Amino acid sequence: MRILFAGTPSFAAHYLSVLINSPYKVVGVLTQPDRAAGRGNYLATSAVKQLAIKHNLPVFQPEYLHENNGKHIIEHISVDILVVVAYGMIIPQDMLMFPKLGGINIHGSLLPRWRGAAPIQRALWAGDIKTGITIIQMDDGLDTGPILYQVACKILPVDTSTTLYAKLAKIGSTALLATLKQIITGSQVIEPQNNKFATYARKLNKKEARIDWQLTANQLERCIRAFNPWPISFFKIRDTIIKVWGAQIDDINYHHIPGTILSVDPVGIKIATGKGAIIITQIQLAGTKQMPVKDFLNSRPTWFIPGNILE
């Protein structure tokens, strides 16, 4: 089986690695164009491109896909199937007609829940107790195709997007290889999605990561875990951005204005929220490494004063 792989971030690179080390042949890689990144605005290549180059695979980086350039790529390298993981660009329906076996998409949720760009983060953000990997036959919709394979995993109260990515990558590897085997043997079972249960996982943005103290402590703690490793929850004090990497919930309702600093000690900074309080335990200043609150307080003991109200 000759595979054209389409993907961009490290989550996708994991699946490319699985395919490279499988009995199947990866004949080419589609990934997003190199983008300017960082303070120096340097040109950054995707994790998928880096892995492809390491294994001497042809790399295609069109600014956008349409029928003609998609057809050219597939015909040029003779593709049996297109495998898509977090590519980040819409695959035109016409392009799916060119591979002999069509295209499949590996998605990080239990579809039809959390269709869209950020399914792993939105599952944490919403307080879901489980998620999973769904492999679908691609159609002209956004994550709407019929289900070929689905496997679930628990979301633990301590999970972040980082840990959940790792869990899903592990179970997804087995799911991908099993699906390809079923396609080859013609034994796959196709199940249409029930659109009645569909939800949308909109893309994350940095503005969303700013902590809103009006939310409940439970909601804020979930946001902090969901936005790790990006965009990282933050708040401002003394016109300085403080990123929050770890927090705990205090369910007691203190009846203070949300954002009020309730107490400060080496364990954490307790702050009133819309309901309950959040205890911030792990923080980071710009240009420094993340650190326990006690280390921050040792060098800046007057930054957090009980009774003061944060923005």
UniProtKB/Swiss-Prot annotation:
A Pfam family it matches: Formyl_trans_C
Superkingdom in the source lineage: Bacteria
UniProt: (6S)-5,6,7,8-tetrahydrofolate binding residues: S109, L110, L111, P112
Signal peptide: none
EC number(s) per entry: 2.1.2.9
GO molecular function: methionyl-tRNA formyltransferase activity
UniProt keyword terms in alphabetical order: Protein biosynthesis, Transferase
GO CC annotations, alphabetized: cytosol
Gene3D superfamilies for the chain: Formyl transferase, C-terminal domain (3.10.25.10), Formyl transferase, N-terminal domain (3.40.50.170)
Catalytic activity, reaction form: L-methionyl-tRNA(fMet) + (6R)-10-formyltetrahydrofolate = N-formyl-L-methionyl-tRNA(fMet) + (6S)-5,6,7,8-tetrahydrofolate + H(+)
CDD domains tied to this protein: FMT_core_Met-tRNA-FMT_N, Met_tRNA_FMT_C
UniProt xrefs under HAMAP family: Formyl_trans
NCBIfam families cross-referenced by the UniProt entry: fmt
Its biological purpose: Attaches a formyl group to the free amino group of methionyl-tRNA(fMet). The formyl group appears to play a dual role in the initiator identity of N-formylmethionyl-tRNA by promoting its recognition by IF2 and preventing the misappropriation of this tRNA by the elongation apparatus.
Name of the protein: Methionyl-tRNA formyltransferase
Gene: fmt
